[in-house]
Amino acid sequence: MSDMFRKSVLNKLPHLPPTRAPWADESEPIEEIDEEDEQLDGIGEFKPATMGPSKHDTQDYSPLSASTFFAQAAEVQPPSTPCTFRVYLTPPNLSIASANAGTPPGPSGLRTQQQTNRHGTYLVCHHGGGASGLGFAPLAREVKAKGNGEMGVLAFDCRGHGKTSTSDPNLELDLSHDTLLSDFMAIIEMMFPDPKESPSLILLGHSMGAAPVVSAAPELQKKGYTIPGVVVLDVVEGTAVESLPLMKSVLSKRPESFRSVIDAIYWHVTSNSIRNVESARVSVPHIIVPAPSSSSSDPSANPGGKQVWRTNLVGTEPYWEGWYKGLSQRFLRTKCARLLVLAGQERLDRELMVGQMQGKFQLEVMSDVGHYLHEDNPAGLAATLITFWHRNTRVLVLPPKIGAPGPGARGGPVEVKQVGQQ
């Protein structure tokens, strides 16, 4: 594995003492490092767990309620799965969508019209491994604000994460690609049982979540759902597969526990795991759980005390490769608009590079964000998503030619071809 690649992977991780990677800037002071120390188990260390914010730190690290960001929360139990999923959603404002169906003509006399589904449009979000649906909370608020409420947002905690529960604990860590896909399809079909009466669905997946989302798009289209676009956040198959040997080492550097929820939020912010304090305050409490007390095996028996990770990511190792193998090919084959959003100058693999040169998908690169780009800069991502949605669900109404028949004859909107469609 080249130093350049390792640097691209580790740039997503916190750069904090006491350990610094051997390829760091030579102008900065650094202790002598033997070649034998440059092994995988010695790179990319996280900041160790701390005693929490100091008395002089005026920043508020207390947890925030999801109600500030989402309009509703629900428990969804599809009959085909052993899980009861926690779902968060903000429905679209259909009255606003209808009122904004057309736009006034510009200087050229051209007019655009929104291809509105009378049931609205939802952005459906699938989080990555170890995260939760509330990682999309600030994004949901920004999408509502920047889209004038026309686009709804739905996010959920996938199996083995957040507030989702599983009837058989042995199935909590079954996070294979097929299981994630089956769960995702079951939630969609439970929330929107009739494809003809369903809103349009723009599917978004972050990291691990990209795998089921990309695979679900054609399956949902076969069932009659309208899927205007698919969005993938910060994952490239080639880079992801190459980085898998690093993952166990990276996970082993995380603290095993925290003294409290506030300490966990503080660690995520100060380690640069999440660079947005507000987002950390709403998302972090849902990726940790109270540690079992010495007298009870029930994690809820110790509320407010020592906290441990909700999801055993190391236990999902058998499924890691399955999340990413074939992802680029499936992404490029989806019959809808495609958007790939990356954090920093991540390199594309061969298939995506060729696809990008052929104009098969839209590529956006966000700066000054980490791997959790939707948490670090929700406003910037929301603006990109709203533009992507409008671009791929609008028609161009051309003015009639001189001497041409009036409206109703040969006139009418000319549909703009969607990005990435053949």
Swiss-Prot record:
The reaction(s) catalysed by this protein are:
[phosphatase 2A protein]-C-terminal L-leucine methyl ester + H2O = [phosphatase 2A protein]-C-terminal L-leucine + methanol + H(+)
A GO molecular function term, named singly, is: protein C-terminal methylesterase activity
The answer to whether the entry has keyword Phosphoprotein is no
Gene3D superfamilies noted in UniProt? alpha/beta hydrolase (3.40.50.1820)
Q: List the disulfide bonds.
A: none
| EC number(s) recorded for this UniProt protein | 3.1.1.89
Region Disordered, annotated ranges: 1-27
Q: Which residues form the active site?
A: S207, D234, H371
Keywords of the record? Hydrolase, Serine esterase
Query: Enzyme class, one word?
Result: hydrolase
Q: Domain of life of the organism in this record?
A: Eukaryota
A Pfam family of the record is: Abhydrolase_6
Q: Family assignment?
A: Belongs to the AB hydrolase superfamily.
Q: What does this protein do?
A: Demethylates proteins that have been reversibly carboxymethylated. Demethylates the phosphatase PP2A catalytic subunit.
User: What is the protein named?
Assistant: Protein phosphatase methylesterase 1
